[in-house]
Every structure is written in structure tokens, then in C-alpha cells.
Amino acid sequence: MTEPAENLKGIFIESDQIFQIYVKTTNSDQLVISTEVEGETFETLEIDTALQNDLLYITTGRSVGFKAFDDKLAAHKVLSVVLHIELPANKELWVNSSLASVEAQGAFSYLNLNLSGGRVNLLDFTGSGVVNTLRGAIDVETKTTKIEASSRNGSLHVATSPVSLYKLTLKSVDGSISVTQSE
């Protein structure tokens, strides 16, 4: 899917069926979304989009008439969904998921990630935001960002920057947090 994004504030992904989300910012004015879906019931997956409050909402569901398996092998009939997103620079990224891990690279106007099991990897990250994980580790490579980090049971390795143009709050219950600041 390719859409013009000049009027979008950003994207909001809410799904417990997506396994991995890759987001990279670009200098283009186009939003590009592609998916990889594997599993025995892949054809029943629906990726739904809707525009609300200038955000493109992305959710997942099953097609009408889909019935979940109720047999001894049901636990082995898993679905793997991976999203690849190219987002124009300086847009917002919001993700709520109990399963997904997120890898984001580039410049964002705001980032809000709330993940239960997934990890977060921010590469060459510029922007402000909040990252919360329950079990997943948080790794950030940034510059000129004030970092507030806390983990109840994980380790903290946080580099500070003498210049703070942005603020990023990182919290995890069981995950470790690592931040490097490049010059």
C-alpha cells in the first residue's frame, strides 16, 4: 500500500497479531506499508486501516466466517505477521501491542510505544517520546536527546548528551535498557 502522507500526522498501530514492526523514515511524502504473513491460516488475516484525528490507524482482524481451531494441534497453528513501513520524516509513530517488537530508524516528531512481550530497537533515532515495555529490552541509538530511563528488574546502561533537543522516556519492568549517544 502506498499513500500520500502530507496531511497525515502519523500512524497508530494496534494489534496483538503482529509479530514484528519495522519503520524507517524517508524524505519522501509517501507512506509505504508492506506485509509478510505466514501460517496455516494466513488467508484469513485482514489488515484494516482508518483515518482518525489525522492518524492512520492500522489494526488486524480475521475475515468474516473465520472459526478458530479447536483441536489438539491448535497451539501449533500460529500466524506470523511482519509490517514494513516507510514513513515520511518527522511524523508520529504510536504502537500498542502485547506481541510485537518494534525497530524504528530515523526522525520522528513523536514516538509512543507500549509493548508487553516485544523489544524495542531505535536506530539513528531523532525525536521525543515515550517507550514502555513489560518484558522486552529497549536499545536506543540517538543524539542530542535527554533520556529518562528506569527498569525494575533489568539493567540500565544510559549515555547522556550535553545538548538536549529532545526528551525520551524509557520504562521497562523486566527488560534491560541501553542507550548510546552519537556526536
Question: Which stretches of residues belong to each language-model region?
Answer:
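Intrinsically disordered, low-complexity terminal regions
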Residues: 1-183
